[in-house]
Amino acid sequence: LLPNLLKSLL
């Protein structure tokens, strides 16, 4: 969940 958003930002 969170990791997905983080990767999207990066």
Curated annotation (Swiss-Prot):
Tissue and organ expression note: Expressed by the skin glands.
Cellular component annotations (GO), alphabetically ordered: extracellular region
Leucine amide: residues carrying this PTM: 10
Main localization (coarse): secreted
Swiss-Prot/TrEMBL keywords: Amidation, Amphibian defense peptide, Antibiotic, Antimicrobial, Fungicide, Immunity, Innate immunity, Secreted
UniProt-annotated location(s): Secreted
This protein's name: Temporin-1Tk
A GO biological-process term: innate immune response
Domain of life assignment: Eukaryota
Native organism: Rana temporaria (European common frog)
Purpose: Amphipathic alpha-helical antimicrobial peptide with potent activity against Gram-positive bacteria, weak activity against Gram-negative bacteria, and moderate activity against fungi.
Similarity comment: family membership: Belongs to the frog skin active peptide (FSAP) family. Temporin subfamily.
